[in-house]
Design a protein with these regions (language model features):
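Hydrophobic faces of well-ordered beta-strands that scaffold small-molecule active sites
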Residues: 3-9, 26-28, 56-60, 92-94, ...
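Glycine-rich phosphate-binding active-site loops on the catalytic face of alpha/beta enzymes
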Residues: 25-37, 83, 87-99, 144-157, ...
Length: 243
């Protein structure tokens, strides 16, 4: 089976680069420093307009932080899912937990029903759930198509033992997609160890600002941002290294 590469794309242009590099699919996100949040209508529509072959999955996450949502946040998620259906994207990506760290089955069912017929991926909320094997069976029963996971570790290489066990237990009933720390120099090891066929990675490079006048004394965001005059973007050449 051919290796399937999903790129975590932070913009419409990153989707263009991912397609040019040969990726199968993107997960389109805003708010990368927060772990990914729902992109805007304009970003999704532009990504669709500028690409023709790549599948676009859109993350549905109204904020950073935990995965315990208020009803107001759920309403926002439902509206964003409806928008994604109108824009005819390939799929949506979300995950919801209870206060006790279990999959919020009723809420996930509600969102999955709203998303039909789009593909549904459970994102790395899975990595902070209490019992991954119970969660696996619940997500299969709910009809999720895939789980994005680092094996409940800080990166997918460290999570190899759990991901391999998840692939084994899933037995083809759901796709287990390793992500977080997947690089061109370790994807072969992860593939061989886990038996996974779909992989999630960023494949980004820094894009430097073309601003000539620069006031570097006034940051626009968090102090962890290294410079106001650089961003990151999917790099088509890096994508090619995974194919």
């Amino acid at each position: 089976m051919k290796r399937i590469i999903e790129i975590c794309a932070n913009s419409a242009q990153s989707c263009v680069e991912a397609e040019a590099g040969g990726a199968t699919r993107v997960e389109l996100c805003a708010g990368i420093p927060e772990g990914g949040t729902t992109p805007s209508y304009g970003e999704i529509k532009t990504a669709k307009a500028l690409t023709s072959k790549i599948d676009i999955n859109v993350i549905i996450r109204p904020r950073g932080g935990d995965f315990l949502y208020t009803e107001a946040e759920v309403q926002s998620m439902l509206l964003d899912i409806e928008l994604c259906k109108e824009l005819k994207v390939h799929g949506v990506v979300f995950g919801c937990l209870t206060k006790d760290g279990d999959i919020d089955v009723p809420l996930m069912r509600r969102l999955i029903e709203a998303a039909k017929p789009l593909s549904v991926t459970c994102h790395r909320a899975f990595d902070v759930c209490r019992d991954p094997f119970t969660a696996l069976e619940q997500l299969i029963e709910l009809g999720c198509d895939r789980i994005l996971t680092s094996g409940q570790q800080s990166d997918a290489v460290k999570g190899i033992p759990l991901i391999a066990e998840l692939v084994k237990r899933a037995d083809g009933r759901i796709i287990i997609m390793p992500g977080c720390g997947v690089r061109e120099n370790n994807i072969g090891e992860i593939e061989a160890e886990k038996g996974a066929k779909e992989f999630h990675t960023s494949a980004r490079s820094i894009v430097y600002s073309k601003m000539e006048y620069r006031n570097e004394n006034v940051p626009m965001g968090s102090s962890i941002v290294s410079s106001e005059f650089e961003t990151v973007q999917t790099d088509r050449e890096k994508v090619k290294a995974y194919i």
